[in-house]
Amino acid sequence: MVKIIFVFFIFLSSFSYANDDKLYRADSRPPDEIKQSGGLMPRGQSEYFDRGTQMNINLYDHARGTQTGFVRHDDGYVSTSISLRSAHLVGQTILSGHSTYYIYVIATAPNMFNVNDVLGAYSPHPDEQEVSALGGIPYSQIYGWYRVHFGVLDEQLHRNRGYRDRYYSNLDIAPAADGYGLAGFPPEHRAWREEPWIHHAPPGCGNAPRSSMSNTCDEKTQSLGVKFLDEYQSKVKRQIFSGYQSDIDTHNRIKDEL
């Protein structure tokens, strides 16, 4: 058994993992299904459309999951791993019942938070080294995928023809400071009275006074998350428009030269 595990890690080490602008996610769904869904969307999105349930934009709740260890039905985040190795290990743990699954390679973007950096000592599963995507991951953000069959990771990376480098080439994950206010600790959690979160506590969280009687800590965290997501989506749209405009300008310049 020890020999098998040793060989397994030698096999993994033959792949290149050091790529700071890429993240990874093990998923049982094939690429065609992911494409049809529009990308890797949070479970809370389908619940919202099916039942009208509001997505929970709370990083602490997301990181804890449910008491049974599964994803929350209203979860507003999608989990990713910082390396191919860790994504493969996650896949072998939670997708062991599938003969085939996929590891998606994903471009970074500022709707993503390093869970350990944001939650610090209160991160419930620090060994997972997770980066969570608020609102999900569009299909155009998926660089490609590896196929895993009976635990064996294919050496070939299948490139996604729908990937749009121009949208994401200059984007990085959000700095930890942008996520402190979205940490989502319970209202009386001691983190809200400690560094660095005390300076970012939403109204009603910890010692921060409520902005109104109707705004609770959870409600304010939710509204801040929605605002953050809207601003991110606007930024990507501006980048898309800028890319299109650049193509038009290049086309017109070539046309004039001819």
Swiss-Prot record:
Keywords assigned by UniProt, alphabetized: Disulfide bond, Enterotoxin, Glycosyltransferase, NAD, Nucleotidyltransferase, Signal, Toxin, Transferase, Virulence
GO cellular component terms attached to this protein's record: catalytic complex; extracellular space; periplasmic space
GO molecular function terms listed in the Swiss-Prot or TrEMBL record: galactose binding; glycosyltransferase activity; lipid binding; nucleotidyltransferase activity; toxin activity
InterPro entries, A to Z: Enterotoxin_A
Enzyme Commission number(s) from the entry: 2.4.2.-
Keyword DNA repair in record: no
Alphabetized SUPFAM superfamilies for the sequence: ADP-ribosylation
Signal sequence bounds: 1-18
Annotated NAD(+) binding sites: 25-28, 41-43
Keyword Cell membrane: no
Pfam annotation, one family: Enterotoxin_a
Positions of the catalytic residues: 130
BP-aspect Gene Ontology terms: positive regulation of tyrosine phosphorylation of STAT protein; symbiont-mediated activation of host G protein-coupled receptor signal transduction
Disulfide pairings: 205-217
Biological role stated in the UniProt entry: The A1 chain catalyzes the ADP-ribosylation of Gs alpha, a GTP-binding regulatory protein, to activate the adenylate cyclase. This leads to an overproduction of cAMP and eventually to a hypersecretion of chloride and bicarbonate followed by water, resulting in the characteristic cholera stool. The A2 chain tethers A1 to the pentameric ring.
Note: After binding to gangliosides GM1 in lipid rafts, through the subunit B pentamer, the holotoxin and the gangliosides are internalized. The holotoxin remains bound to GM1 until arrival in the ER. The A subunit has previously been cleaved in the intestinal lumen but the A1 and A2 chains have remained associated. In the ER, the A subunit disulfide bridge is reduced, the A1 chain is unfolded by the PDI and disassembled from the rest of the toxin. Then, the membrane-associated ER oxidase ERO1 oxidizes PDI, which releases the unfolded A1 chain.
Subunit structure: The holotoxin (choleragen) consists of a pentameric ring of B subunits whose central pore is occupied by the A subunit. The A subunit contains two chains, A1 and A2, linked by a disulfide bridge. Interaction with the host protein ARF6 causes a conformation change so that the enterotoxin subunit A1 can bind NAD and catalyze the ADP-ribosylation of the host Gs alpha.
Family: Belongs to the enterotoxin A family.
Domain text: The four C-terminal residues of the A2 chain occupy the central pore of the holotoxin. Deletion of these residues weakens the interaction between the A subunit and the B pentamer without impairing the pentamer formation.
Name the record gives this protein: Cholera enterotoxin subunit A
Organism: Vibrio cholerae serotype O1 (strain ATCC 39315 / El Tor Inaba N16961)
Lineage of producing organism: Bacteria, Pseudomonadati, Pseudomonadota, Gammaproteobacteria, Vibrionales
